[in-house]
Amino acid sequence: MASALGTSSIAVLPSRYFSSSSSKPSIHTLSLTSGQNYGRKFYGGIGIHGIKGRAQLSVTNVATEVNSVEQAQSIASKESQRPVYPFSAIVGQDEMKLCLLLNVIDPKIGGVMIMGDRGTGKSTTVRSLVDLLPEIKVVAGDPYNSDPQDPEFMGVEVRERVLQGEELSVVLTKINMVDLPLGATEDRVCGTIDIEKALTEGVKAFEPGLLAKANRGILYVDEVNLLDDHLVDVLLDSAASGWNTVEREGISISHPARFILIGSGNPEEGELRPQLLDRFGMHAQVGTVRDAELRVKIVEERGRFDKNPKEFRDSYKAEQEKLQQQITSARSVLSSVQIDQDLKVKISKVCAELNVDGLRGDIVTNRAAKALAALKGRDNVSAEDIATVIPNCLRHRLRKDPLESIDSGLLVTEKFYEVFS
């Protein structure tokens, strides 16, 4: 999958920090003896709960080789990837593009749900983000893309190594974008324990799933409204808590799984439950372009890309690099962006008067407004910033009224101007 692969480069650190590329990480084993209560053990980058009174067994983490191989091969794999349509070449759909950019700048916004007509470029736009994603530092060979500097994004094993004073091998890699297919099983998403090994060898081998690969990255679900509800629940819980827990055969295994969840779908094929919609930070509505000249331009641009992808991508290289620099700069100044107290009060007043349940709407609107101010290069949020993002932050949180003909986004906009005027 092209979009799930990222390019990597070794950070400039002393050579002693790096292990030989030809050596494979050893597979560690933890023995649990019958009749003993081990409590919570941390091993192999995962948290393991031993259960008192169980027969003797071993827990093996078989994932340690996966990321090291991917990181070593990522530069070569970039050349063989399917060409991605440039983000800056997308015509129109400004609302969707803005929501995606704000989530890249501040992943804590909570993802974005994109709903719209067929053939409006939803999947193309999301996958085109891969070229704009900034590089991040990860611990070499770690299957969970642990952050070597932030304990919040560290696997348990890496955190213990840091506490012991061990120097870590670090690589620079682009943020991953992982596609979740509709036919994926819960084991493929969350990770699986090999029961056959447990029966034949007395070993329980844990193999991380897509949530581990998406840690500190983006997880994209096309046609999310057709995904099984229990899988959507798993994705949203992991995205909100930042951890994935797998319970199998008396063993509880946890690992970091903090990612930006992006879903897209066609409302004609079914809606998400309101309680699930509320868990997405922002909601973008995409419509078919009606302007004839814009439609012609889109067709011509797509034709150019299909004819010669490399030449087409090169023609947008300068715009892509400029946008990537804007994103990197916005991420670096985001923590210094301030929002005045009176603006916070007005945001909450809009939410209250619209009868928005809970406080997620207030929180997300504040975060999105700050991210937009950072993208514009400012350190203070303006009312204009709030007006731009608040429809996308609240429209999917309003209670449905079957007798209401006006779009929920317009209701939010009307209430905003009523309160802020």
UniProtKB/Swiss-Prot annotation:
Q: Which Pfam families does the UniProt record give?
A: AAA_lid_2 (PF17863), Mg_chelatase (PF01078)
Q: What does this protein do?
A: Involved in chlorophyll biosynthesis. Catalyzes the insertion of magnesium ion into protoporphyrin IX to yield Mg-protoporphyrin IX. The magnesium-chelatase is a complex of three subunits, CHLI, CHLD and CHLH. The reaction takes place in two steps, with an ATP-dependent activation followed by an ATP-dependent chelation step.
Enzyme Commission no: 6.6.1.1
Lineage, top-rank taxon, reads: Eukaryota
Transit peptide (first-last residue): 1-61
Cystine links in this protein are: C99-C190, C351-C393
Pathway involvement? Answer: Porphyrin-containing compound metabolism; chlorophyll biosynthesis
Tell me the NCBIfam families matching this sequence. BchI-ChlI (TIGR02030)
* Biological process annotations from GO: chlorophyll biosynthetic process; photosynthesis
Query: Which residues does the record give as ATP binding sites?
Result: G116, D117, R118, G119, T120, G121, K122, S123
Q: Subunit arrangement?
A: The magnesium chelatase complex is a heterotrimer consisting of subunits CHLI, CHLD and CHLH.
* Originating species: Glycine max (Soybean)
Activity regulation annotation text: Redox regulation; active in reducing conditions, inactive in oxidizing conditions. Thioredoxins f and m mediate the reversible reductive activation of oxidized CHLI.
Its annotated compartments are: Plastid, Chloroplast
* Keyword Chloroplast found: yes
Q: Which reaction does it catalyse?
A: protoporphyrin IX + Mg(2+) + ATP + H2O = Mg-protoporphyrin IX + ADP + phosphate + 3 H(+)
Indicate the family of this protein.
Answer: Belongs to the Mg-chelatase subunits D/I family.
One GO cellular component from the entry? chloroplast stroma
Query: Matching SMART domains, A to Z?
Result: AAA
- Record's protein name: Magnesium-chelatase subunit ChlI, chloroplastic
Gene3D superfamilies annotated for this entry? Magnesium chelatase subunit I, C-Terminal domain, P-loop containing nucleotide triphosphate hydrolases
Q: Which GO terms describe its molecular function?
A: ATP binding; ATP hydrolysis activity; magnesium chelatase activity
Keywords attached to this Swiss-Prot or TrEMBL record, sorted alphabetically, are: ATP-binding, Chlorophyll biosynthesis, Chloroplast, Disulfide bond, Ligase, Nucleotide-binding, Photosynthesis, Plastid, Transit peptide
